[in-house]
Design a protein with these regions (language model features):
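Polysaccharide-binding surfaces and accessory modules of carbohydrate-active proteins
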Residues: 4, 9-12, 16, 29-194
Length: 194
């Protein structure tokens, strides 16, 4: 269900129907594939090709504005909407979350949050040592359905107060295409209710 390819630093989350894959290059997570189940090939060829001197395929030249960021934040050269914004006591929003490790766990219960009971959960940990913030992304892939859930847990591991500006559980860059969007307006447990 979960596989980590050490040589390419690529995570493969897969069941009989789908594959979700992302890589961690220079400590930064980058989305590679979400769709029909595919072999565990080196998917780094699917990365976006930039038209600038910053090219994600050349070591040391990556710009986060040119990758499909798995965990986009403020102030890292990515001009799209970030999924996470954390302010320190000086008002600084800059974050530099770097991959520190991962582990596979039985499906944990998310205290105080609605949660599913799908199967094992992949926890991927990122830290900003200067700001004192740990972000843990939790991925659960259901064995018998084309469904993936993701959540994020934040921990203040420093000595200073941090203020949360925004925190989304998921961010997903879609390639250019013609899409239809279905929105169920309403509120929790009252979707499609005016």
């Amino acid at each position: 269900m979960f596989h980590f390819e050490e040589t390419t630093k690529t995570f493969y989350l897969e069941n009989n129907e789908i594959t979700y894959a992302f890589t961690v290059e220079n400590g930064i997570p980058e989305h590679l594939w979400f769709g029909a189940r595919i072999p565990r090939d080196d998917l780094r060829y699917t990365r976006r090709v930039s038209c600038t001197s910053c090219d994600a395929q050349l070591p040391g030249t990556m710009s986060e504005n040119h990758i499909a960021a798995e965990l986009p934040t403020y102030g890292r050269g990515d001009f799209r909407e970030p999924m996470l914004g954390v302010r320190d006591e000086t008002g600084n929003l800059l974050l530099h979350l770097v991959y520190t490790g991962h582990r596979i766990l039985p499906q944990p219960r998310l205290d105080g949050m609605p949660s599913t009971f799908g199967g094992e959960t992949l926890e991927v940990t990122f830290e900003d040592g200067e700001k004192g913030l740990r972000a843990v992304l939790l991925y659960t892939l259901f064995a018998d359905a084309a469904a993936l859930t993701r959540a994020m847990r934040l921990e203040n591991i420093g000595a200073h107060t941090l203020m949360l500006d925004r925190a989304f559980g998921f961010s997903f860059d879609l390639p250019v295409g013609a899409y239809e969007t279905l929105t169920l307006a309403g509120s929790w447990a009252a979707e499609r209710t005016p």
